[in-house]
Structures are given as C-alpha cells and as structure tokens.
Amino acid sequence: AAPVELKTNKVYPIENYGSSMAPFYSTLSIWIGGIVLVAMLKVTVSENGTTGLKHLKLHQIYLGRYLIFLILGLLQSTLICLGDLFYLGIQCKHPFLFLLAGWVSSIVYVNIIYTLTVSFGDIGKAVSVVLLVMQVAGTGGTFPIEVAPGFFKAVYPLLPFTHSMAALREAVGGLYAMDYWIDLGKLCIFLVVFLIMGLVLRKPIIKVNEAFSEKLEETKIM
C-alpha cells in the first residue's frame, strides 16, 4: 500500500519535444529568411531605377525598398508558421496568435536586417549574422537561460529572439494573463529603434561610411 498518493496537475502541458522546440526553430527560420533576402535582393535603388522620379528623398527610398522586403518576409513567416501547424502538426492552443507572433517577428527582423544592410553595406550583413549566432546561444532556445554564461544572461532581455519565442510559446501552450501582448510590445520596440536609425540617423551614417570607404581605398588593401 502506498501511504502517500501523488496527484499531478499539469499546467500548460506540451505534448511532445517537437512542439516545445517549434518556437525556437520558427524564430530562427524567420531571421535566416531575412538574411537570405538581403543577400539576394538589392537594398538600394540604382540610378536607372529612379528614371523619371526626381528629388527622391532618403526616407522615400528607404521605405519604398523596405516594402518589398516586408512583403516577402511576411510570405516567408506565413509559410513557416503554416508549415508548423499543418505539415508538422505541432500542438498549438491558439493558431491565429501563433501566426500573428510570426508576422510581427518577421516585420521586426526584416526591418533590423534591412536597416543594418542599407546603412552599413556588407558590414551590416555581417552584423546580422553575428546577431543570429548570439541569439541562438543567448536566448534560451534550446537550454534554459539560467544555465547560460553570465554574458548571455545579461543580454537576454535585449535580444529580439527572447520576446518572439516567448510569444510563440504562449500561443503553443496557452496564454498567461497579458504576457503574450507584452512580449509583442517589447518586440515592437526594436522596430521603432531601427526605423529611427533608417529614417533619421541614416544620413550621417552614410557620410561616415563614404569617408571610411575613401580611406580604405587609399590604403590599397581592399
């Protein structure tokens, strides 16, 4: 006879390992999709492309080109999330919220990668890859953040993956209070920051890049 009877009450249960890892790999795929876009498509408008359009301002070029990347990014994220839901058949308590989190993540990620690339060129692409590696290691995607080194614990709240995965996990396992919307709100802060960089700070950044390129050419190294 058992003197103690254990009663288990599961809270936000996840059915299988694949469903628990879906938020991480979906987030990772959306970011990689953004990197692929800037690698395949031009982020700037050529002189031939502006024929007949006079006095185009930097913010008009920035937003016009970003719209193309935004549409393609949303298509990518839709395919990824629908693939999770209907092809892989992951557990998901709130399918629409899962899709919404994927869309918001794509809007933010594509903007970050696009802004870095249009502002810094190839250096911006490299920074996007570095950010990818940092976020894979430092956002608790595969292991709890509590077991990560101190550096990653410090930057954990400052990385976009953190809030995307949290929102996607809420959609998969079930909502708790307003956490889902709070995570999406935090994610949108990155969008505001990089929009300011692309629309306001880009002009002085371009001047610095041009000066740097001229100095680099003078060295004859590259």
What are these regions (language model features)?
Residues 1, 5-222:
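Membrane-spanning alpha-helical segments of multipass transporters and channels
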